Amino acid sequence: MRPAILLTNDDGVNSLGIWAAYEALSPIADVTVVAPATQQSAVGRSISIFEPIRANRIKINGNPAWAVGGKPTDAAIIGLYALKLAPALVVSGINIGENLSYESIMTSGTVGAALEAANQGTKGIAFSLQVEDQGDKFDDPGQSAQSFDAAKKVVRDVVERVLASGFPPAADVINVNIPSTIKGGYEVTHLARKLFHTGVEKRLDPRGRPYFWINGPLLEDAEEGTDVHAVRKGNVSITPITLDCTARTADEDTKKIFLK
């Protein structure tokens, strides 16, 4: 029997990235697409608790899918509980744009869906493809000019390896970032602290009232061994992630503050 995979994303069910992943995985698994109906980038692991969630059965290029009127986390939960799928893995992506560093995995809906699946008992793998032009992240994902050919090979190979060997026991999610041009092989990495400089741009609307854009250029350097450094070298970054955010090495110092 072929393994079952729940495939989701944050770019939306119409994204070329999710269908590239579908093409990569369909020959080796029974893949069910359950993804947000619309673009949901940068919503992280947020969840819809104040509005109903609708899931509609649709077809895209003849392939069945579920379009969920919510966030990536909602899609994962709907797939696991409402549709009663019992996948061997949840795969999220291929995201159009890299998801690197602490700041990105905390805001990424792609990684958020994989984390939610892991929290519900099914390990997840998140796949993201680097873009050379950061503006490409904000274009229509259904009309992306990105080439997914190399990324599809990575998706299939990574999933085949995990299905054959099992998930790393101490990890809950594997975050895979694929460079726009692959020059090397796989590199197991840890998260960099930041990917972008943080900036705020103030503008005035037509009535003269201020509004703000949060923006900032990419950082130019990154520590060796980090996901950012690996992708910039042209390596595929593979970062094991755990749900447990507890800073256990800080236990003793924290006790000195609060338990004296």
UniProtKB/Swiss-Prot annotation:
**Does Metal-binding show up as a keyword for this record?**
yes
Q: What class of enzyme is it?
A: hydrolase
Pfam families recorded: SurE
Record localization: Cytoplasm
Which top-level group of life is the source organism from?
Archaea
Binding of a divalent metal cation: at which residues? 10-11, 41, 95
Cofactor binding: number and manner:
Binds 1 divalent metal cation per subunit.
Catalytic activity, EC: 3.1.3.5
Q: What are the record's GO terms for cellular component? A: cytoplasm
Q: What is this protein called?
A: 5'-nucleotidase SurE
Q: What species is this protein from?
A: Methanoregula boonei (strain DSM 21154 / JCM 14090 / 6A8)
